[in-house]
Amino acid sequence: MNTRTKKLPPLRVGIGGPVGSGKTTLLEMLCKAMRAHYDLVVITNDIYTKEDQRLLTVAEALPPERIMGVETGGCPHTAIREDASINLEAVDRMLRQFPEADIVFIESGGDNLAATFSPELSDLTIYVIDVAGGEKIPRKGGPGITKSDLLVVNKTDLAPYVGANLSIMEADTQRMRAHKPYVMGSVKSGKGLREVIDFITERGLLPPMPAQG
């Protein structure tokens, strides 16, 4: 199988999803799990603040200089799709500073089910929804659910507390996504995290990450 080498551009992974779905937590957990094996940098998007950058820095997901915050100043989906120039510029700046990067993670601001990443900006897209948002979320569809490369149905541990039926959610997810991959998990506790990592490395032509001891 072909693998990505330093001769290839870094893999750009877009992470999107509604506010509160767990995008930043997923990004934190990915960085902490993968940073010993891959050269990582992160770009976060917020409308008027750099709160997600701050959260990742406080959590020590990566060294502060490897986390860049972007203030979009408007609809967050515009900055990742219709006019991605502010993010493309941020990627260029980060890669000038870290030319050996293997992966650039780009986290969108909280957006809706219609948001998607521009193919100019992202090689792979991961869309995060959460069980607490309601059992009906998967069947609402939208490009994030139907067209993302990987769908993460997060916070499955909360299902008993919010009256959500995981079997129904999974069946709806399968129906809406046809044969596209998805993960049912709770990334804060680590459930499903390895599946996300394996998806990134396999689809991104990166060497597989060693199993955790």
Swiss-Prot record:
GO terms for cellular component: cytoplasm. It comes from the Bacteria. Pfam families: cobW (PF02492). GTP binds at residues 17-24. GO terms for biological process: urea catabolic process. One of its GO terms (molecular function) is GTP binding. CDD domains: UreG. InterPro entries: CobW/HypB/UreG_nucleotide-bd, P-loop_NTPase, UreG. The keyword Cell inner membrane does not apply. Keywords: Chaperone, Cytoplasm, GTP-binding, Nickel insertion, Nucleotide-binding. Its main location: cytoplasm. Gene3D superfamilies: P-loop containing nucleotide triphosphate hydrolases. The keyword Iron-sulfur does not apply. It is found in: Cytoplasm. Homodimer. UreD, UreF and UreG form a complex that acts as a GTP-hydrolysis-dependent molecular chaperone, activating the urease apoprotein by helping to assemble the nickel containing metallocenter of UreC. The UreE protein probably delivers the nickel. Belongs to the SIMIBI class G3E GTPase family. UreG subfamily. Facilitates the functional incorporation of the urease nickel metallocenter. This process requires GTP hydrolysis, probably effectuated by UreG. This is Urease accessory protein UreG.
